[in-house]
Amino acid sequence: MRALIVGGSSGIGLSIVLNLLGKEKYESVYVIDKAPFPEKYANDKVVYLPCDLSNGKYDCLERANDIHALYITAGFGHLKFFQEVSGDYIQNSFSVNTVAPLQIIRHYYDRMLSAEDFYCGVMVSIAGRLASPLFSVYSATKAALSKFIEAVNVELDVQGYKNRILEVSPGSLKGTGFSGGPSQPELTATLADEIIRRTELHEELYIPQYEDIFKGVIARYEADAHKYGVESYWYKKKRLEAK
């Protein structure tokens, strides 16, 4: 088997790569990323394909057509008041966080329209499901991605296919380097394993720490979205000021 991890040079994508490298059934693991694959984790199974998702060109996919699993983990976001956001930032955010995943999934979609297993997991974000002030652009990109996945999974179901796209929507994750720190795969290894497990079961939604944290958070949001948003605003503002 062969897998492709988009965004596999860092964060949760790197953890997924390392997990798959440990599985005998995977003979090759393609990594698409703007950043080089870390030399520290060099492995003969890894095929690194440089690609900048912000430019709208996906020629690199042609070198990874023979895959059986697809994990899309690339994405970025920054705490910003909307008045501080530039037009280029908005464009790049949607290009990387939303348009690229849709285009990549479309490239491999014929594999999903099959009786054979094709595994697909996509990192979204809990920010796409809640009011997220100071993360307005990021949450918008992820909300669009979430709704796309929901709709396509319905299409697959009604058309009689077993394959699904797993939406993974976590909150803040330690060890991913999302906020600028280094990637620490050992901190996200358990999560990576669970993402792979659920993807291979063709599940549709996984919210890590749902019972412990996000069940209550979502309930608060649904009870009074504006009140929740105001509380989120002040919480994020304190985080921004602490940097």
Residue ranges: model-predicted function:
Residues 9-17:
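N-terminal Rossmann NAD(P)H-binding glycine-rich loop of SDR-like oxidoreductase domains
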Residues 73-79:
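Conserved NAD(P)H cofactor-binding loop of Rossmann-fold oxidoreductase domains
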Residues 81-82, 89-92:
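Substrate-binding pocket helix/loop in short-chain dehydrogenase/reductase
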Residues 105, 141:
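Active-site helix of classical SDR
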Residues 125:
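Residue(s) in the substrate-gating loop at a strand-loop-helix junction
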Residues 131-139, 151:
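Active-site loop-to-helix junction immediately N-terminal to the catalytic Tyr of the SDR YXXXK motif
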Residues 163, 167, 180-220:
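C-terminal helical subdomain
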